[in-house]
Amino acid sequence: MLISKEYQSLNEHLHKNPKYGSRRREALYDKIADFMAETECKTLLDYGCGKASMREYLPAYSYDPCVPEFSVRPEGAFDMVACCDVLEHVEPDLLTNVLVDIRGYADKAVYLVISTRPAAKVLADGRNAHLIVKPLDWWQEVLTQHFPFWQLTITNSDISAITVLGINDGRR
């Protein structure tokens, strides 16, 4: 299981707000495009796509279990999986399942952006929208466990988020 029915319902409610997740992120999409070119990736999965704004800039398959029009699970693998501002929203007891799922979709590379601070948004049940608020060191340990044969470059690009660039060394 990747998400509980209760949490999926809370997130569907949050995503119905036209302002939630609608921010354009051209600078981020440029960085993803550069990493795709550097790693010679042709296909891209936007995992946890929200409103799927990445598709306006990059040829991405959009998947998000909390947005009905993007909830169809993709078939097969992609050269790269981008998962931006998603992992901190995952239910802690299901994080392993989600990371295994991401790894299963990624043939060559991953581009992850993970917030390390509480969200401004609150779920309808009163919890902060970021269910996992952990520092870079914690994420580095978790990601290294789930991507053991990958070259991971983890940077703390600003005080509130980390960026992870992962390249598969061919062993999966």
Residue ranges and their predicted role:
Residues M1-M80, T96-V100, Y105, A124-R172:
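Conserved N-terminal segment of class I S-adenosyl-L-methionine
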